[in-house]
Amino acid sequence: MKCKLLVAEDELIERKVLCKTLQKYLGDLIVLYEARNGREALELFAREAPQVVILDIEMPGYTGLEVARKIRETDKNCGILFLTGYDKFAYAKQAIAVRALDYLLKPYKEQELVFAVEDAIRQVSAQRTPLPPRA
């Protein structure tokens, strides 16, 4: 079964490049949803229930950190990744507080992004797959 992945990025070109990269390397593993801002991200999250979410930190509507906090209220296992141009320690600390799986800085290398998403998919899949009963 394919993993549902939500990308929330307010910059159109950045979002399109990000989605194109994900489709190129992981297209057979993912179903991709795109949000232009934090509010749209929350609407898509509620409707589609993606297993992995990539959030920009600074977006209109709600920031990526606010979106992550709201996601955590209903889904403790969603794989959250931050992709941001802000190299601020305070943001990184807040990302840790919402149990983000990764915090990538722009500009990113394609392989760095792909590895982070693959790792998130693995972690989320392991959490959601019931363990077999002990013998």
Task: State the predicted function of each range.
Residues M1-R134:
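Alpha-helical/coil-rich non-catalytic "connector" segments in signaling and regulatory proteins
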